[in-house]
Structure formats: structure tokens, C-alpha cells
Amino acid sequence: MGNSFGCSASGERLVSAARDGDFVEAKMLLDCNPCLAKYSTFGGLNSPLHFAAAKGHNEIVGLLLENGADVNSRNYCGQTALMQACRYGHWEVVQTLLLFRCNVTRADYLAGRTALHFAAVNGHARCIRLVLADFLPSDKLNSLPETGVVTAKNKSEQSALSKFVNKAADGGITALHMAALNGLFDCVQLLLDLEANVSAVTFHYGTSMDMIGAGSTPLHYAACGGNLKCCQILLARGARKMTLNCNGWLPIDIARMWSRHWLEPLLSPNSDVVIPAFPHSNYLSLPLLSILNIAREFGLQSATIGDEVDICAVCLERTCTVAAEGCEHQLCVRCALYLCSSSNVPSVTVGPPGSIPCPLCRHGITAFKRLPSSLTREMKLPMSLGFCAPCMLHTGDTTDQSSPTCPPTEQRSSKTRAASVSSDIFCPVTCSPFPSVNIPMCTCNEGTCPNFETHGTERHSEEHVESSPSRTTTEQEKIEEGQRLGKTTTCSSMFWGRRSCSRENQCNSEINA
């Protein structure tokens, strides 16, 4: 009971080590008691995995998962470690969590946000690419057409990709709405290439920003954000200028209300401005799923077989275990996985859209295949990703190690491959236990941004202004406008009101302590 309610001194030491990135301390504690990996704090129910993922300590994330930490554990707000990693843009942590087969479709309790929403709102395109990797198999896709829409041979896989990308949070806000509002062009471009619905509208009920209105499209949100390129690519991909939201406002009306005057020539219904053609996103990665599946099944360690094994030409440390389809150049699993996860080179110069340039010949890679002589099935346990240097504390062979406190059935279940994602698990309307309230939206790319207070705060401000009779009506209006627009907030407070925000702050205050 002490472990569950946060009364364990050793558990708190592990939390501190995970937060501070103290790998030596964390390993010592887990060697003494592997069950500490499942510890959770008293207030926010954050596990050490949440702390390590939020802070980007990838080696500790791998250590915790190897010692039995639940990769899908939730905190008090229903957020997983994957959501924390996507929130702060730690793509290497996201990659490690995917190797341990985390559930990317889970939504939090506050506003029904998935890891995709957390990555999109803060502009982390690499995290978006990784989160959507399991929905984009390279061997099931044709070439990307000029419209930028992915065409899948298997309709069920296409439907699963489309449903997850367009999964709505509270109020009907999709990841594309969030990226468009904050002017994050790379994320908008990538989401559009991956079947994001350019005509998706927010719900006619629930939360929606008062100054944008319910029933708004991503173009309405992009007009509020003020990013010209985001508006251009939305129009190029089929967004309509004449779409009215529930308030009867066009996108150009939103731009005028928010003083985005530079958008008026583009969004005007009678505009003759030429919309440029946009290429496919540099963050598309077709071979990512193939190398992820190889790493999941066989691990990241290379099996040494004799003296004739080729050494990876990229790292010059490990043996070659996979080969690129097409050019047949061989790499180790780690380098191939790192290449697919970090590359953002325009695919036009190397091959089909979404292909990754081979580091040896620049040929476009669309998939990887394993070398049968170099990988053995005994190495199914995924290891943490340390691309720069091997772990100084790793001793002995870990393939046959087992936790003395975990039964064999649990060990076998953790190594089994995850089932394919069904298209029936997605619900178009997000169920949230908390009532919907006004959404203060963020329109900035950096730092702080204007916020809209709740009606209770506005009434308090009005009473304060009315208490000074010497002020004229014009002065009162200016003061009210300044109070309404002057208060600043960050992008993380977009989708919930006071009650939900207090719950969010309770969880995050532990991590950011």
C-alpha cells in the first residue's frame, strides 16, 4: 500500500533519479528492487517513467521499461509517458516507447487528447512521424499523388490512419486545428500528407474558442493564427474560403477580428492571388515501420557471427543487420532506425515521396529487410537507444535475464508483438468526464500569447472598472480590452477550464518541480 500511495522512500529516490537523469542511482535502486519501476507518486500518480519521458532521459526510460514499468501507465490526468514525451518533443523517448509497443491511441481524461494532439500543438513533427508510423506501412502504399493524400491498397489500413489523424479532442478540435492555430507549417504539411481532413469542423457544442466559434475549419484557425504559409497550403489542399462557422463568420472575418490584415488578399472571396504548389513534407518516412518492426522483434543488439561479418559503415561499431531494399546497402539496426526517425531531407531529390536517402549512395529507401545470418530471435528484448555511446553499466548478456519478482507469464506477454490497430476502436466524439468550457487559444509560435479569460473573470474585471466612476466609457472599454488580451498563457492551457486546468497543474507541478 505504501508503494501505491507514494509512501516509499526508495520510490521517491527513483522518482528523483528519473527526473534528474541520474542513471547510476536509478540502476542501483532497480537492481535492489525491480518493482520500484511500477511506483507512482501520491498526488499526481506520476510514475518514474512519466518523469523520465517528460525530461527526455532516454536511457532511464529504457531501463525502467526493461525492469517491468508499464509503458501505458496513466497519471491522475490520464496521460501516459508517450504524451509527456510528445508534449516536450523528445522524439528519441517516443521511439523507445514505440519499441516497447506503447498504445498510441489512448486519450487523456481532461480533453480527450492523444499523443498526436500533444505533438501537434507544440510543433514536434518528428514525434508526429513516429506516432503515426504504425499506421503507414511502406509495403501497403502506392506512391504519393500530387495532391499529397496517401493512397493505401488496404482500405482498412487507410481508414485506421484517417480516423486516428482526424481523431477529435474535446470540442471537435483535431491535431490539424492545433497546428494551424499556432502557425506550425511543418506539422500542418505533414498532417495533410497523412490524410488529415482539411474540412474538419469543430463540434456545434462543447468547447470552442469564443473568438473563432464552433463549426470552424482548420482554415478558420489558421486565419486566427496568422501564418500565411499555413493558409496557403490549406487552400492548396482543398480548404474553402466560403465556409461559414456557427457564428456566420468566414475565415477572412476571423483574420480581420484578430488584425491579421496580411491575410486579407489571400482569404478574400474574390481574391485572384495565385496559391503556390507545395511539395510533400520532408518528415514523411516510408521505411520507418519496417525498421521499427525489425527492432521490436529482434532488438537493437547485433549478433556477432565469426570474423567475416561486415561492420556498419555509419557507426563503425556494430555489425550490419539490415539491408535497404533497392540499393541493398547494409546498416546496423540502430543506425537505420536513427536515420528513419531523424531525417528531414526533401524526398524529391532522392526518390519517391517519403523515401529516406541512403547515407552511402543517396538512393531513396522505402523499406528495410533484415539479414537472416545476423539477427537471432533470442534477442527480442528491446534495449534503450543510446546512439552516442554504449551504456557503461551494462554487463553480461541480458537476453536471458528475468526479474525475480515477475512471473514467467508476464515476461512472455511483454515480449509478444502488439496486434494490429483496428479501425473500429476510434470514436468520433470524445468522452470526457469533465464539462466543456471556453477554450483559451494560443496564437503564438514562441513564449507567451494572448488569452481569453472565463466569464467569471470578466465579470470580476467589469465590477472593478465600474467602481471608478471618474473613468469614461471609452476608457472603460480600453481597460476591458487590455485585461482581456493582456493576460498571457502558454500553449499547454488550450483545452480546459479552471477545474481541469487545476488537475493538469497538479500532475505537471510534480514533473517540473
Swiss-Prot record:
RING-type zinc-finger residues: 312-362
Q: In which residue ranges is the amino acid composition biased (Basic and acidic residues)?
A: 455-466, 474-483
Key words of the record: ANK repeat, Metal-binding, Repeat, Transferase, Ubl conjugation pathway, Zinc, Zinc-finger
What the entry lists under Gene3D superfamilies is as follows: Ankyrin repeat-containing domain (1.25.40.20), Zinc/RING finger domain, C3HC4 (zinc finger) (3.30.40.10)
Q: Write out the ranges of the repeats annotated as ANK.
A: 44-73, 77-106, 111-140, 171-200, 214-244
Top-level taxon = Eukaryota
Enumerate the transmembrane spans: none
Q: Name one GO molecular function term.
A: ubiquitin-protein transferase activity
SUPFAM superfamilies per record: Ankyrin repeat, RING/U-box
Pathway(s) served: Protein modification; protein ubiquitination
Reactions catalysed according to its record: S-ubiquitinyl-[E2 ubiquitin-conjugating enzyme]-L-cysteine + [acceptor protein]-L-lysine = [E2 ubiquitin-conjugating enzyme]-L-cysteine + N(6)-ubiquitinyl-[acceptor protein]-L-lysine
User: Does Repeat count among this protein's keywords?
Assistant: yes
Q: Where is this region: Disordered?
A: 397-417, 455-483
Q: Which SMART domains match?
A: ANK (SM00248)
What is one process in the GO biological process aspect for this record?
Answer: protein ubiquitination
Question: So what EC number does this one have?
Answer: 2.3.2.27
User: PANTHER family under this entry?
Assistant: ANK_REP_REGION DOMAIN-CONTAINING PROTEIN-RELATED (PTHR24161), PALMITOYLTRANSFERASE HIP14 (PTHR24161:SF85)
Per its database record, what is this protein's job?
A: Possesses E3 ubiquitin-protein ligase activity when associated with the E2 enzyme UBC8 in vitro.
Instruction: Please state what the protein is called.
Output: E3 ubiquitin-protein ligase XBAT33
Question: Taxonomic classification, please?
Answer: Eukaryota, Viridiplantae, Streptophyta, Embryophyta, Tracheophyta
